[in-house]
Amino acid sequence: MAKSLLCSSTLNPFFSTTLSSSKKNQIAYSGNSKNQTSSSLLWKRRELSLGFMSSLVAIGLVSNDRRRHDANAAILEADDDEELLEKVKQDRKKRIERQAVLNSAVKEKGYLQDLVYKLSKVGQAIENNDLPAAGLVLGKGIDTEWVKTVNLAFTKLSTSPEENTEVEAFNSSLASLITSVNKNDIESSKLAFVSSAGAFEKWTTLTGLLEQLKGL
């Protein structure tokens, strides 16, 4: 009994101390756990806050870039509009000047109208295989008076490289036509006539005379 009591009285303080220490450790651990949880939540909140702020900054930068891009695009578009408007003005000015020249070129248009009639007669003669009749209209060479007057009209009314190119093509084809007709070469005459008439029609289209000359 005494031994039992001794053991009991000896062990109780040890168990009490152990239990007390264990409870303190549990409380301390619980406290540390709560502190760690609080710290973890705090860090998460900070991370979320920083992430949100970073997103706002990124959105702001993108918005600024877009605004700058839109502003630059607006400036370029305005420049394009001004260039287009200036081009329209220049084209209109050229058309007015060209029309004034055409309206005043009464004599030159008369020369060109005579050319239309001659080409029509030559075309009919070639179609009928009547090259002598075509030769009477054309003459013997390109140094005839009507060819000279036609080229005077070409020179006065041609204002662009494209128009001058068609004049050169016409004169070259006309020379071939006169030569072929005088040689009584029907096939070459047909080809040369088509080339001459085509070049002249293109020239009248470029100069704006297509609607002013009869028979085209």
Curated annotation (Swiss-Prot):
Q: Any idea where this protein resides? A: Plastid, Chloroplast thylakoid lumen
Q: Which InterPro entries match?
A: MPH2, MPH2_C
This protein's UniProt keywords: Chloroplast, Plastid, Thylakoid, Transit peptide
List cellular component terms (GO). Answer: chloroplast; chloroplast envelope; chloroplast stroma; chloroplast thylakoid; chloroplast thylakoid lumen; chloroplast thylakoid membrane; cytosol; thylakoid
Domain of life, per lineage: Eukaryota
Gene Ontology annotations of biological process type: photosystem II repair
Organelle targeting peptide span: 1-38, 39-73
Q: Which Pfam families match?
A: MPH2
* This protein's name: Thylakoid lumenal 16.5 kDa protein, chloroplastic
Give the organism the record lists.
Arabidopsis thaliana (Mouse-ear cress)
